[in-house]
From Swiss-Prot:
This is Ubiquitin-like protein ATG12. Ubiquitin-like protein involved in cytoplasm to vacuole transport (Cvt), autophagy vesicles formation, mitophagy, and nucleophagy. Conjugation with ATG5 through a ubiquitin-like conjugating system involving also ATG7 as an E1-like activating enzyme and ATG10 as an E2-like conjugating enzyme, is essential for its function. The ATG12-ATG5 conjugate functions as an E3-like enzyme which is required for lipidation of ATG8 and ATG8 association to the vesicle membranes. Keywords: Autophagy, Isopeptide bond, Membrane, Protein transport, Transport, Ubl conjugation pathway. Forms a conjugate with ATG5.
Amino acid sequence: MSDKDLASSLMELNIKVGTTDIPQTIAEEQNQVTDTKEEVLDDETTIKNDPQKTKITLNQSMMLSKLPAKTTSAVLSVSKPTESKIQIRFKSIGSVDQVSPAVFKISKSSKFSSILRFLELKLGKKVYCYLNNSVSPNPDEELENLYNIFRVGDELIVSYCNIVAFG
């Protein structure tokens, strides 16, 4: 058996057994040793260089105090916390019973189908819903988008009835 045949059969054995991470040359072996040292050094340096997270208000920030007035107002308006819930007011149309209480809060990320299900469970019958007595939204629409477009004041008005009322 020649050296080439022996080397190829050893390579096949390594592939079959799954020990392909054995270094084939001295250079590969040296690279593996240096890689492990770099990993240890990287772990130590990231621990040492990891900054401590502190909460500094926008009014206390040195960088923001030196910004122009327009930029500061833009940053402050963007950084205000947003509400995660929106207010929904239900209004009945026709002979359908009024849901009580008429005002609810729901998550912005919810779909309009959750309102349909809620009303159908509360009333015990199928309902047709409209926003501002004009638009019947798709059940897959997110409430946040509908709220941004159709809100009146600080609430979304959802009218409902048991028959098709508009259009």
